[in-house]
Amino acid sequence: MAAKDVKFGNEARIKMLRGVNVLADAVKVTLGPKGRNVVLDKSFGAPSITKDGVSVAREIELEDKFENMGAQMVKEVASKANDAAGDGTTTATLLAQSIVNEGLKAVAAGMNPMDLKRGIDKAVISAVEELKHLSVPCSDSKAITQVGTISANADEKVGSLIAEAMEKVGNDGVITVEEGTGLQDELEVVKGMQFDRGYLSPYFINKPETGIVELENPYILMADKKISNVREMLPILESVAKSGKPLLIISEDLEGEALATLVVNSMRGIVKVAAVKAPGFGDRRKAMLQDISILTGGSVISEELAMELEKSTLEDLGQAKRVVISKDTTTIIGGVGEKHSIQSRISQIRQEIQEATSDYDKEKLNERLAKLSGGVAVLKVGAATEVEMKEKKARVEDALHATRAAVEEGVVAGGGVALVRVAGKIADLRGQNEDQNVGIRVALRAMEAPLRQIVSNSGEEPSVVTNNVKDGKGNYGYNAATDEYGDMIDFGILDPTKVTRSALQYAASVAGLMITTECMVTDLPKEDKSSDSSSSPAGGMGGMGGMM
């Protein structure tokens, strides 16, 4: 086991604080409408330029191991805020830096660290309650546009595109961000349920000019099994042929004579048919087939439920207004499933999302939810260069997370004003002793830090502006973009309540742990033995010089 380097008390805390400040100082220059860019060097390719706090934080590793521990703990604040609300990483980092700096000053002055932490926690709990009272629901398109614009660093085009996407696919709809091919940002909306499976044979194509299969008012057969024997399918094929409607078959796989028979029937015009594989794998495939059956009002033919394909009738089949199948995707539009069945399935998936533990599971469940409830929107980001594209894509993703958070928990006045107002409302809060009171004051002072930094980044004097904002009431604040005072809601400067709340809670949580740190342990650097061996006279194969 490697030998350890151990530091105690003030010596440990000073080192840790130095690391906190290096990381936070790098992150906080990006805050606000006049925040600066940070250039990140890459081991290959062009450097990337960003104004995203968490992207800056992730890049920072310090040489001194004790300082690095401090930096990594603040990085954790940014990551947690990002995971919870998708935005507010810079605010969270700044709040943590302020609490740690003020808290460690108090510890150095002889205060009890545990009481300081209790005071900070008490202030944060009260502040979160006050934030909830200040919060205003965010439901209309204008408010969503404003939130998106602020989070995308005052890019109005991005804000309005996100609002348009949410309007089209609903608040639960999936909105993905992709790199576009042109200079302009574009919005593409896919209505209905789409999954990543294309036709099993190009002979099914009935629109050769576009290379797709289009079926109008088709029956949809869903089978959770491989189909290779054509005899199983004959009864249902005959029933569909009599009805005169087309047929879509979605199964685990379709091969051999079954596929050949379908192709021949389709080409001869006996029955208009197309076949695709079921989406997903394992249990997820079963769940997605069930989703499709509920959406289209049919049943999944499953051997687990003792159902046989030969005995299935037209009543077991789903129906839709239209199905479009390309080489890679299948889109079912206008399923005829019962509304209440679809709603109860949506509620069930929502419940599963709350209980899911892994991010991957949550993402897949959200996709299923969106496909059932509205559709999928794709935001294609346009830019002139690859460097700009990456920077812009990160901003658009931030803005998207922020608008989702705003719809979920509402909005408060932006520009750091909400936290200043909250601090004013709980200024009379008291702890059980003087050390706890100091902890409360540390938290209250930290709540001014975002406003001060926004002002500082815009080149004004933080103390003057902060005092002016404190003297105002309600949503009165400072618009750093235009250098004027007024109502922040009227200015369209809004922050999602969830983002502000998460930033404060995670910052206080990690900062509290750092204030109560008394000892730090890390590995001692290993001595490099290779330098000793290289100085030996023989130097490895050096004695073989005469062999050349």
From Swiss-Prot:
<dbReference type="InterPro" id="IPR027409">
    <property type="entry name" value="GroEL-like_apical_dom_sf"/>
</dbReference>
<comment type="similarity">
    <text>Belongs to the chaperonin (HSP60) family.</text>
</comment>
<keyword id="KW-0143">Chaperone</keyword>
<dbReference type="InterPro" id="IPR002423">
    <property type="entry name" value="Cpn60/GroEL/TCP-1"/>
</dbReference>
<dbReference type="InterPro" id="IPR027410">
    <property type="entry name" value="TCP-1-like_intermed_sf"/>
</dbReference>
<dbReference type="InterPro" id="IPR018370">
    <property type="entry name" value="Chaperonin_Cpn60_CS"/>
</dbReference>
<dbReference type="GO" id="GO:0042026">
    <property type="term" value="P:protein refolding"/>
</dbReference>
<feature type="binding site">
    <location>
        <position position="495"/>
    </location>
    <ligand>
        <name>ATP</name>
    </ligand>
</feature>
<feature type="binding site">
    <location>
        <position position="415"/>
    </location>
    <ligand>
        <name>ATP</name>
    </ligand>
</feature>
<keyword id="KW-0413">Isomerase</keyword>
<keyword id="KW-0963">Cytoplasm</keyword>
<dbReference type="GO" id="GO:0016853">
    <property type="term" value="F:isomerase activity"/>
</dbReference>
<feature type="compositionally biased region" description="Gly residues">
    <location>
        <begin position="539"/>
        <end position="548"/>
    </location>
</feature>
<dbReference type="InterPro" id="IPR001844">
    <property type="entry name" value="Cpn60/GroEL"/>
</dbReference>
<dbReference type="GO" id="GO:0005737">
    <property type="term" value="C:cytoplasm"/>
</dbReference>
<feature type="binding site">
    <location>
        <begin position="479"/>
        <end position="481"/>
    </location>
    <ligand>
        <name>ATP</name>
    </ligand>
</feature>
<comment type="subunit">
    <text>Forms a cylinder of 14 subunits composed of two heptameric rings stacked back-to-back. Interacts with the co-chaperonin GroES.</text>
</comment>
<dbReference type="GO" id="GO:0005524">
    <property type="term" value="F:ATP binding"/>
</dbReference>
<dbReference type="GO" id="GO:0140662">
    <property type="term" value="F:ATP-dependent protein folding chaperone"/>
</dbReference>
<feature type="binding site">
    <location>
        <position position="51"/>
    </location>
    <ligand>
        <name>ATP</name>
    </ligand>
</feature>
<feature type="binding site">
    <location>
        <begin position="87"/>
        <end position="91"/>
    </location>
    <ligand>
        <name>ATP</name>
    </ligand>
</feature>
<comment type="function">
    <text>Together with its co-chaperonin GroES, plays an essential role in assisting protein folding. The GroEL-GroES system forms a nano-cage that allows encapsulation of the non-native substrate proteins and provides a physical environment optimized to promote and accelerate protein folding.</text>
</comment>
<protein>
    <recommendedName>
        <fullName>Chaperonin GroEL</fullName>
        <ecNumber>5.6.1.7</ecNumber>
    </recommendedName>
</protein>
<dbReference type="InterPro" id="IPR027413">
    <property type="entry name" value="GROEL-like_equatorial_sf"/>
</dbReference>
<dbReference type="GO" id="GO:0051082">
    <property type="term" value="F:unfolded protein binding"/>
</dbReference>
<feature type="binding site">
    <location>
        <begin position="30"/>
        <end position="33"/>
    </location>
    <ligand>
        <name>ATP</name>
    </ligand>
</feature>
<feature type="region of interest" description="Disordered">
    <location>
        <begin position="524"/>
        <end position="548"/>
    </location>
</feature>
<dbReference type="Pfam" id="PF00118">
    <property type="entry name" value="Cpn60_TCP1"/>
</dbReference>
<keyword id="KW-0547">Nucleotide-binding</keyword>
<keyword id="KW-0067">ATP-binding</keyword>
